[in-house]
């Protein structure tokens, strides 16, 4: 009788041990972050405690506005301000997973006369803050679906960015409007391991493409990070066109790991209720991925 009880006890201990290891592995494989800009805290130190409150592990910090300036309105190159951000991040156990050059959503990366300084400033900031990923959206003016004639300019400029990023030991993740096959071809033309796809779920979803197939086409090695939300309208848990469990199954099979970054998918009735929108989406993502 005693021997039987000991066997049961050993079995339970082993089960709990392996369960703990699986949970730890899942947490290491998928981490959840949020975009400071979309939390209405663009380059504001208050984004750090807010990130902790809504339950994410990381932040994508914005480089600041661009407009017609030669470079971003970036406070993070100020030593004292940057030190405050780093201290707060340590205090709240928040990781800066990426720096976003969101100014290029509106400004033209492919047509801007002096694009190099802005990229250099982003990479310099990344190095100073030990951030390994930069986000570069090609934006409305470099939409390669609507303006395929811009492809040569985009490839040439990305090759230059790739050399800069490679020399610094960082990766720049790009967002385009191309489907996965065309984006994979673009990455091949650029030919740099320092230029990858920063995949955004909303792009295939709003264009009627198969999100899960697109992930598989691009493949594990080409995707550096993921904006894991749809357009604004409903929260992730209420989104009927986005099967997050199927997303996880797809990423698991691909062997992909990294940061899943909450950007949009805000409730249209309360778009500025940051704690509700990001708190709900963070909890939902953690319930599936962690």
Model-predicted segments: where are they?
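Bacterial Sec-dependent N-terminal signal peptides
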Residues: 1-28
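Charged helix-capping and loop-helix junction motifs
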Residues: 75-82, 113-120, 148-158, 210-216, ...
């Amino acid at each position: 009788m005693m021997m039987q009880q000991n066997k049961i006890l050993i079995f339970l201990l082993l089960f709990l041990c392996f369960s703990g290891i699986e949970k730890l592995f899942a947490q290491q494989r998928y981490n959840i972050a949020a975009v400071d800009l979309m939390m209405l805290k663009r380059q504001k130190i208050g984004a750090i405690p807010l990130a902790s409150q809504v339950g994410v592990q990381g932040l994508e910090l914005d480089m600041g506005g661009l407009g017609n300036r030669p470079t971003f309105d970036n406070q993070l190159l100020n030593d004292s301000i940057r030190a405050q951000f780093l201290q707060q991040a340590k205090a709240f156990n928040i990781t800066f997973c990426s720096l976003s050059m969101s100014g290029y959503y509106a400004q033209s990366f492919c047509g801007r006369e002096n694009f190099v300084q802005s990229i250099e400033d982003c990479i310099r900031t990344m190095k100073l803050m030990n951030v390994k990923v930069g986000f570069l959206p090609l934006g409305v003016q470099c939409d390669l679906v609507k303006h395929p004639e811009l492809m040569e300019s985009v490839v040439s400029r990305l090759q230059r960015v790739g050399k800069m990023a490679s020399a610094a030991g960082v990766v720049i993740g790009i967002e385009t409007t191309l489907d996965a096959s065309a984006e994979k071809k673009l990455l091949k033309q650029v030919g740099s391991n320092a230029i990858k796809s920063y995949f955004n779920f909303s792009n295939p979803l709003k264009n009627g493409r198969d999100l899960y197939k697109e992930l598989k086409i691009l493949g594990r090695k080409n995707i550096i990070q993921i904006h894991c939300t749809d357009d604004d309208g409903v929260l992730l848990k209420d989104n009927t066109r986005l099967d997050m469990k199927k997303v996880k199954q797809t990423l698991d099979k691909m062997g992909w790991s990294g940061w899943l970054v909450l950007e949009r998918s805000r409730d249209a009735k309360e778009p500025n209720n940051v704690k509700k929108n990001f708190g709900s989406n963070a909890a939902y993502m953690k319930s599936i991925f962690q």
